[in-house]
C-alpha cells in the first residue's frame, strides 16, 4: 500500500501510520491456519489488557479466569460513562471523537493512536482496491454547524481532496447546481449517505441524465450509513453510470465491511472479530439473522469487547480470514410493534411499503412513524399528492403485512427531517420510546 500525502496531518499528530500499514500487510499475508491463531491471540490479548489495566471493564467481567463465550455482551448504554472512567490510566495519548449514530444522543469514544492509525490504513486499503483513495471525491455528508468543528471539517476536506455538497438542501434547484458542479470538476467518485444519493439519482432520472456522461472522470460511488436496497442500488448505477459500492462501518469501531470488486461484502477480519448472536447471546448458524456483535482487537483506550452495535444481520464464513456480510437488516431497536405484542424489523416493513408506494406515484422519499399499535404516520416527498384511491391501496398493503387493521395519516412534505449530520431515519416506532 502506497503512502499518500494526505497522511501527513496524521503523522504530524503522532499517529503511527507507517507502523499501521506494515501491521495490516503482515496480517493480510497470514495463512488461514496462522490467521486462526492470530485471532485467538488478539482476543486473549485485548481482554486481558482491559481486565488488568481498566478498572471499568474489570468490574464488568468480574472474573480473570474468563471464557470467551461467558464474556458479557456490551451495549452503547453500558459503555456510555465518562471517558476518564473507561480509559486505562496506562493510555496517555489517544484519539477522541463522538457519534450520535441512530439514537441522536452524543456518544463519546476513544481509541489509542495505533488503533486509530490502523483504521485509516484499513480504509486506505479498501478504497485503494477500487483505485479511488486520495482521488477527487464528491462528498455527500452533513457538516457540523459548530464553528470550530465546521472549520475542522473543511480543513479535512481540503487535505483529503474532496468537495462537500450541502445535503441539507435537496431541492430541484440544488440538484441542478450539483449537476453544473459535476460538469466543471473532474470527480473520480461519489461518497455519502445512501438516501441523499438515491434522491440525486431520481433527479437525474427525471431529467434523463447520466452523471458519468456529464463528468467522464467518474469511476465509483460509495454509499454508507443507511440501508441500500437492491432497487435503489440499480437506480444509482444506471443514472450515475458507475458501480455502487456498499460500505458498513461504525465510528467507534472501524470499517466493518466493504464491497470488493467481485461484489462481495467482505467483513474486516483484520482488526475486528464479528459475531452474530441470538437474544440469549449464543452464536447463530451462518446465514441466520441475529445481533451484530463486534470486538475491536486493537483498541486499548476503550473496551469495545463483544460490543452490540445495534444492527441485525447475517454472515457467511468462507474461512477465518474471509467472512462475507450476507445481509444487513437495520437497527435492532427499530421494530414495528404488532397487535399481539410481537415485533417485526422496521426496515423490512419500510421496504415493503416503499416498494408499493413508489409504484403508485412519483414519490421521491418516504418516512414511516408508528405512533400507536394501530396508527401510523407516513411522510412523503412528491410532486403530486397521493389520491384517495392510492392511499387506500397503500393502507390495504400495510394491513396485509401487519395482519391487523391500522389507520394511516399521510403527510406530503417539501422535504423530510434529517439528523444534524444529514442522515435520514427511515422508520421510527414512538412506542419503543415509552
Predicted regions and their residues:
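Nucleotide 5′-phosphate-binding alpha/beta core
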Residues: 1-98, 103-136, 143, 184-191, ...
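Generic structural signal for residues in well-ordered beta-strands
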Residues: 162, 244, 274, 407-410
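Conserved adenylate-forming
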Residues: 144-268
Amino acid at each position: 500500500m502506497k503512502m499518500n500525502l494526505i497522511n501527513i496531518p496524521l503523522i504530524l499528530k503522532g499517529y503511527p501510520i507507517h507502523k499501521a500499514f506494515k501491521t495490516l500487510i503482515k496480517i493480510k499475508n497470514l495463512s488461514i491456519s496462522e490467521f486462526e491463531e492470530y485471532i485467538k491471540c488478539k482476543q486473549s490479548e485485548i481482554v486481558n489488557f482491559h481486565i488488568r489495566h481498566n478498572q471499568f471493564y474489570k468490574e464488568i467481567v468480574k472474573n480473570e479466569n474468563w471464557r470467551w463465550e461467558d464474556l458479557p455482551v456490551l451495549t452503547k448504554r453500558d459503555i456510555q460513562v465518562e471517558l476518564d472512567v473507561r480509559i486505562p490510566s496506562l493510555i496517555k495519548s489517544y484519539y477522541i471523537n463522538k457519534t450520535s449514530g441512530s439514537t441522536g444522543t452524543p456518544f463519546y469514544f476513544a481509541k489509542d493512536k495505533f488503533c486509530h492509525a490502523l483504521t485509516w490504513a484499513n480504509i486506505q486499503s479498501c478504497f485503494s482496491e477500487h483505485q479511488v483513495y486520495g482521488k477527487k471525491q464528491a462528498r455527500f455528508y452533513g457538516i457540523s454547524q459548530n464553528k470550530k468543528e465546521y472549520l475542522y471539517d473543511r480543513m479535512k476536506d481540503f487535505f483529503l481532496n474532496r468537495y462537500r455538497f450541502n445535503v441539507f438542501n435537496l431541492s430541484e434547484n440544488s440538484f441542478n447546481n450539483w449537476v453544473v458542479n459535476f460538469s466543471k470538476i473532474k470527480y473520480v467518485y461519489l461518497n455519502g449517505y445512501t438516501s441523499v444519493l438515491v434522491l440525486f439519482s431520481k433527479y437525474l432520472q427525471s431529467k434523463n441524465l447520466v452523471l458519468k456522461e456529464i463528468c467522464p472522470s467518474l469511476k465509483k460511488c460509495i454509499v454508507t450509513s443507511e440501508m441500500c436496497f437492491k432497487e435503489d442500488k440499480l437506480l444509482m448505477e444506471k443514472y450515475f453510470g458507475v458501480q455502487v459500492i456498499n460500505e458498513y462501518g461504525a465510528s467507534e469501531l472501524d470499517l466493518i465491511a466493504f464491497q470488493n470488486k467481485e461484489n462481495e461484502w467482505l467483513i474486516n477480519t483484520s482488526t475486528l472479530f464479528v459475531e452474530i448472536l441470538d437474544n440469549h447471546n449464543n452464536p447463530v448458524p451462518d446465514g441466520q439473522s441475529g445481533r451484530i456483535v463486534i470486538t475491536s482487537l486493537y483498541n486499548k483506550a476503550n473496551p469495545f469487547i463483544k460490543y452490540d452495535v445495534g444492527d441485525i444481520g447475517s454472515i457467511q464464513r468462507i474461512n477465518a480470514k474471509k467472512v462475507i456480510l450476507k445481509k444487513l437488516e437495520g437497527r435492532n431497536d427499530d421494530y414495528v410493534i404488532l397487535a399481539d405484542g410481537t415485533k417485526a424489523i422496521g426496515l423490512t416493513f419500510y421496504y415493503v411499503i416503499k416498494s408499493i408506494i413508489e409504484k403508485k406515484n412519483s414519490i421521491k422519499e418516504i418516512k414511516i412513524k408508528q405512533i400507536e399499535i394501530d396508527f401510523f404516520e407516513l411522510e412523503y416527498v412528491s410532486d403530486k399528492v397521493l389520491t384517495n384511491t392510492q392511499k387506500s391501496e397503500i393502507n390495504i398493503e400495510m394491513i396485509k403485512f401487519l395482519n391487523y387493521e391500522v389507520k394511516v395519516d399521510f403527510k406530503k412534505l417539501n422535504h423530510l427531517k434529517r439528523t444534524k449530520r444529514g442522515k435520514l431515519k427511515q422508520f421510527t416506532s414512538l412506542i419503543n420510546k415509552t
